[in-house]
Amino acid sequence: MSLRIGMVAGEPSGDLLAGRIIAGLQARAPGVHCAGIGGPQMAARGFEAWHPMHALTVFGYIDAFKRIPSLLSTYGDVKRRLLAEPPSVFVGIDAPDFNLRLEHQLRQAGTPTVHFVGPSIWAWRYERINKIRAAVSHMLVLFPFEEALYRKEGIPVTYVGHPLAGVIPMQPDRAAARARLGIDADARVLAILPGSRSSEIRLLAPRFLQAAAELVRRDPRLQCVVPMVNPQRRAEFEAIAAQHPVPGLRCVTAAEGQGETPVAWSVMEASNAVLVASGTATLETALYKRPMVISYVLSPWMRRIMAWKSGQQRPYLPWVGLPNVLLRDFAVPELLQDEATPAALAEATWQALTDEAGAARIEARFTALHQDLLRDTPALAAQAILEVADGAA
């Protein structure tokens, strides 16, 4: 009988991860059958999707509230199928609110469970470790420090590296990226990434644009380039940019990035420095070895929600940006909340743009970080999943 694996991925990043894991599983266990919730990358590997990935996609608390009936229906159907015909192992990729609950019920029924991408308990709500311990047979984590954390808590864990480290080149090619984007080879370029969500753009774009205007005043030759994930976000950003004009500002979307490389990656690679919203983009910037200034602002309402959910006013770690968390140091500046003024952002970004010695030091630290994160992620993940399945057989 062929190996059967249940899987749930709820976001494009999870779909990409899962697609590569399925490829790794197929190389080691020909005939393996994977089914559950997934996206196009998983489907391309023969995944049987009971529900499309977007069935789990929500945008903020209001959207989540509106989607409760459909989310519960999807959850109930997936749980019923997996309990009726238990797989050899279940793999939840990220989406912790959905997957940890499902994993707990499956594990209680005797199905071993693997969770890929550890929730950020190291940043807030550490008490979730108890839910993870009850729900998960084996954790697969992306960052080296997470392995020690879960091992200390008695949870079987495997560090599999971060897949981005295997995709982004160890030695970025600034000239090639500029050629793709039509940017002069000798220009000074600032990449501006105010986030991919409407709320992030609304709160960060005005500050970033005012900072950029000051930087262009200091250096009229400076080129500011803003990658946008889709035309809708571009329209939202450009409406704000009309109120905060920056000479020579350029927005680019996927069609202008040329080739399969995400346009944001091309802009990072082409840049001298990056002004970036906290999130995965900070890790991508680090892997491109670029100096950066990290910023984030929450609305007053979201500040209250986050404080209530976490039961704390401050995070467990002094760092917010992933590069700083991984390096355990303020390697790059973080300007958050009330500190994220246009003047402060401009000053920190000017330093990132003009300090050549500092840029060389950052490049060396980010190169070492890249090497630490570089593993054969699909192979390591597939091997761990198969070992969990074999152990339960």
Curated annotation (Swiss-Prot):
Gene Ontology BP terms: lipid A biosynthetic process
Q: Can you quote a single GO CC term?
A: membrane
Q: Which domain of life is it from?
A: Bacteria
The EC number(s) given in the record are 2.4.1.182
Q: In which pathway does it act?
A: Bacterial outer membrane biogenesis; LPS lipid A biosynthesis
Q: Which CDD domains match?
A: Glycosyltransferase_GTB-type
- Principal EC category: transferase
Q: Which reaction does it catalyse?
A: a lipid X + a UDP-2-N,3-O-bis[(3R)-3-hydroxyacyl]-alpha-D-glucosamine = a lipid A disaccharide + UDP + H(+)
Example GO molecular function: lipid-A-disaccharide synthase activity
Q: Which UniProt keywords apply?
A: Glycosyltransferase, Lipid A biosynthesis, Lipid biosynthesis, Lipid metabolism, Transferase
What residue stretch is flagged as signal peptide?
none
One Pfam family named in its UniProt record: LpxB
As for what it does, the entry says: Condensation of UDP-2,3-diacylglucosamine and 2,3-diacylglucosamine-1-phosphate to form lipid A disaccharide, a precursor of lipid A, a phosphorylated glycolipid that anchors the lipopolysaccharide to the outer membrane of the cell.
Q: Which PANTHER family match?
A: LIPID-A-DISACCHARIDE SYNTHASE (PTHR30372), LIPID-A-DISACCHARIDE SYNTHASE, MITOCHONDRIAL-RELATED (PTHR30372:SF4)
Family stated for the protein in its record: Belongs to the LpxB family.
Would you tell me the protein name for this molecule? Lipid-A-disaccharide synthase
Top-level taxonomy = Bacteria, Pseudomonadati, Pseudomonadota, Betaproteobacteria, Burkholderiales
